[in-house]
């Protein structure tokens, strides 16, 4: 089994009311980044991450499309821990938190979702 394709999208989700706090300031929407990982058997897993406001979403999307996709293609989607380690080591020089962590977490969720679908189990199991 191999990862055949990765597709990503960026959505700006408006909040029903403006939120504010001392760390993030005014928040009118969230930037939601989705990752779809398809294996060579046609199954697809969906993962996501988000940032607050207009910063970070486009950068996370760019990292997924330009850096992470090439690292994932051809990998065994069942080997989730090894893929996590591979991504962490490949990206840790550009940041152990923030955008790199957001992107890796979206991939991780998509891989677990794909595994759950393959095993006909709910994701929480």
Where do the language-model regions lie?
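Structured beta-strand/loop patches that form or line metal/cofactor-binding pockets in enzymes
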Residues: 1-53
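Short, intrinsically disordered, charge-balanced linker/junction segments flanking boundaries
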Residues: 121-125
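Metal- or metallocofactor-binding catalytic centers and their adjacent structured scaffolds
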Residues: 38-118
């Amino acid at each position: 089994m191999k990862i055949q394709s990765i597709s990503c999208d960026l959505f700006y989700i408006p909040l029903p009311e403006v939120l504010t706090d001392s760390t993030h300031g005014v928040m009118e929407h969230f930037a939601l980044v989705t990752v779809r990982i398809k294996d060579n058997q046609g199954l697809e897993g969906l993962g996501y991450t988000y940032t607050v406001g207009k910063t970070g979403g486009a950068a996370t999307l760019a990292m997924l499309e330009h850096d992470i996709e090439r690292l994932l293609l051809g990998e065994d989607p069942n080997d989730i821990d090894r893929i996590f380690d591979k991504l962490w080591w490949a990206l840790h020089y550009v940041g152990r938190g923030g955008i790199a962590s957001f992107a890796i977490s979206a991939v991780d969720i998509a891989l677990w979702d794909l595994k759950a679908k393959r095993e006909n189990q709910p994701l929480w199991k």
